[in-house]
Amino acid sequence: MEEFQGYLELDRFRQHDFLYPFIFREYSYALAHGHGLNRYMLLENIGYDNKSSLLIVKRLITTMYQQNYLIISANDSKKNPFFGYNKNLHSKILSEGFAIIVEIPFYLRLISSLEGAEIVRFYNLRSIHSIFPFLEEKFPHLNYSADILIPYPAHLEILVQTLRYRVKDASYLHLLRFFLHEYSNCNSLIITNKSISIFSKSNPRFFLFLYNSYLCEYESIFLFLRNQSSHLRLTSSGVLFERLCLYRKIEHFAEVFANDFPVIPCFLKDPFMHYVRYQGKSILASKDTPLLMNKWKSYLVNLWQCHFDVWSHAASIRINQLSKHSLDFLSYFSSVRRNPAVVRNQMLENSFLLNNAPNKLDTIVPIIPLIGSLAKAKFCNAVGHPISKLTRADLSDFEIINRFLHICRNLSHYYSGSSKKKNMYRIKYILRLSCVKTLARKHKSTARAFLKRVDSEFFQEFFTEEGGFISLIFPRASFALRRLYSGRVWYLDIIFINGLSNHE
């Protein structure tokens, strides 16, 4: 996105926020695709004039407005080379252009807000593991949690209306709305979940932007309501992008809230309420009674149905007691348990024992879903018995070991925060034995015979545990350091969930 600053007239752009002209600029699509449109054109139509990419974009937009577009494309595909292109190629070209263009005002506002407030950017906070220290600190003191599956709208108009709060260019929004309706390939405004799934896979960047805009709008209202119902007022909720009539709407919310709820009973105020979200799943935890959690459950369902016109039901929000149920969040099973400890106290001639049982957050590797992911990837069968990987039998021994080692290290890296290492050891065993069986099958031998034939140092790096690397790097490492490494470790360089771990 930094490359756009060399092309934009920033002062004039910030004054008007016009996005429609960027649709017809060549560099927008060149930056979106990396190598320009020609890469896609040459793959689909060899010999076509590769200098007419901008003209093609204009024709694509023009034909979208024609009511008989599908008829023309079917009848004239042999006469006009333009209509010979794949329709999926059309949507991919335009959607990638739309995605990078609509991000421009948000990126510029983010840069200006960071510069004006002189906020230091902590890139480590982008790590998924940065959430778990927060959970370890807060959740042992809480009683109830609500597992929330945030519904995404099946109505295309909702996604466009969400952008209207932040994008002022009506022409761009009109073209965007028309493109989304044309993509659904139906006259109805309602599309099925299957169509949304196809759109999210074929246009991931554009879909994530629209979905994140919807989440941002939802959470801005939710945080306002949570702030009004809490003793501890939120002083900051991060960087909030500019919205049209934002402060006017906040004043309206405050006025309605004051009129409808002039006095909030004390039992509806909760000073210990915490909210965390990743993608479309969130957790709302509280120290108060289930009555308050059910109240918030009703608030959220009404918010989705009345404000966003998104159908939701109470079953999408499950309220559980933290001490009796586990949280399935970020590919970990997390639960709060009591950690009994006995402390001996000596006072002059008297001594006595103090029994202390503080709560502790346990994070466990979900062994059954993870074995299911390994079975789907053909590393083992459904019950967890390792099998050979057929697709890698044609590689060299070094490449086979290196690929298995890479997968094993990635999983160990992500699940380094597990309270119990036993489940992770089983996953490593499956991967190691699968590697041995793959090599044995390549050399037309059995796993036992292959291990006897190869050198003992052949698998030394593969079978070395992570804890052993500290002894190799620091031979005189203290016992405290080794004990610390054997416990939970959260890394601040993990920005996405491993594919095998993402079983949600």
Swiss-Prot record:
Tagged with keyword Mitochondrion: no
Source organism: Quercus suber (Cork oak)
Superkingdom: Eukaryota
GO cellular component entries: chloroplast
InterPro entries the record matches: Domain_X, Maturase_MatK, Maturase_MatK_N
Protein name: Maturase K
Similarity section: Belongs to the intron maturase 2 family. MatK subfamily.
Keyword hit for Transcription: no
Subcellular location: Plastid, Chloroplast
GO MF annotation: an example: RNA binding
